[in-house]
């Protein structure tokens, strides 16, 4: 999985192609003696693109751990539509798949199973965890999900083209 990701990360216009919704984060209110956990949220569906987004998040988290003393945590969010029972039945398998990918990185991962609309639930988890970014398996800023995340509390990152 990392070989295609590595080749994409050597682009000169990487920031332009991955930042889908730019936002400036407001500084948190963590106490100076307390090491604030750095969090990243990944929208995960089990698709190849969402796996690549999780891989990218785990890579960013790994690099962040090397550069900062703070704990770093990746939050994988799988959202089920209660009107589609098949998505509920697949939830455990899909979140297990995410945990397996994280174990390859030896990264810290929290899995979240939510019921509702994807954009609303991703924004909610990002807000609750005071996330640095939401990562998606999208390539374009005009993707319907990206458009719905325009009010997200943090930047939304996609995959490099």
Predicted stretch roles:
Residues 57, 98, 122:
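Aromatic/hydrophobic pocket-lining residues that form π-stacking "cages" and hydrophobic walls in ligand
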Residues 75-77, 110-114, 157:
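General small-molecule cofactor/ligand-binding pocket signal
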Residues 113-121:
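Charged docking surfaces used in two-component/phosphorelay signaling
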Residues 1-29, 125-161:
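Gly/Ser-rich helix-loop-strand patches that form or flank binding pockets
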Residues 61, 98-102:
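Conserved hydrophobic residues forming the short capping helix/wall of the S-adenosyl-L-methionine
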Residues 88-99:
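Short, surface-exposed alpha-helical segments at coil->helix boundaries
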């Amino acid at each position: 999985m990392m070989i295609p990701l590595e080749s994409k990360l050597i682009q000169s216009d990487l920031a332009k192609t991955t930042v889908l919704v730019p936002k400036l984060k407001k500084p948190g209110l963590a106490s100076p003696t307390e090491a604030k956990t750095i969090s990243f949220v990944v929208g995960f569906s089990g698709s190849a693109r969402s796996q690549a987004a999780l891989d990218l998040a785990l890579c960013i988290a790994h690099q962040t751990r090397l550069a900062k003393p703070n704990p770093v945590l990746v939050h994988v969010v799988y959202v089920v539509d209660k009107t589609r029972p098949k998505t509920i039945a697949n939830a455990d398998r899909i979140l297990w798949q995410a945990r397996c990918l994280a174990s390859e990185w030896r990264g810290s991962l929290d899995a979240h199973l939510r019921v509702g609309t994807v954009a609303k639930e991703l924004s909610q988890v990002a807000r609750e965890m005071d996330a640095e970014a939401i990562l998606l398996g999208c390539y374009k800023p005009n993707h319907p999900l990206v458009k719905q995340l325009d009010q997200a509390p943090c930047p939304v990152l996609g995959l490099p083209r």
